């Protein structure tokens, strides 16, 4: 099964070797047909503590690292 890759913005880097990434998705509301935005936060592994708040990053699904972390940061797009 292929690994999922998501893009989001780093919203917290206070934990050691961990960043919190907010991933936003958009979809059409089934009744109103209006575009709705929903977001979800993922904890991702950052081995070198190199990503800071505001960075746009790609995260990839991986084997569980801890109770909450099952994603790793792959690369950064921009600030």
Curated annotation (Swiss-Prot):
One matching Pfam family: Ribosomal_S17
GO biological process assignments: translation
Record bears the keyword Coiled coil: no
Annotated GO CC locations: cytosolic small ribosomal subunit
GO-annotated molecular function: rRNA binding; structural constituent of ribosome
Role summary: One of the primary rRNA binding proteins, it binds specifically to the 5'-end of 16S ribosomal RNA.
Complex formation: Part of the 30S ribosomal subunit.
Entry similarity comment: Belongs to the universal ribosomal protein uS17 family.
NCBIfam families assigned: PRK05610.1, uS17_bact
Protein's recorded name: Small ribosomal subunit protein uS17
Lineage: Bacteria, Pseudomonadati, Pseudomonadota, Alphaproteobacteria, Hyphomicrobiales
């Amino acid at each position: 099964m292929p690994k999922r890759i998501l893009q989001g913005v780093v919203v917290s880097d206070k934990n050691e070797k961990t960043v919190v990434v907010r991933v936003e998705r958009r979809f059409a509301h089934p009744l109103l047909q209006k575009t709705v935005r929903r977001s979800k936060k993922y904890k991702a592994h950052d081995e070198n503590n190199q990503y800071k708040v505001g960075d746009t990053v790609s995260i990839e699904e991986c084997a569980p690292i801890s109770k909450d972390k099952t994603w790793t940061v792959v690369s950064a797009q921009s600030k």
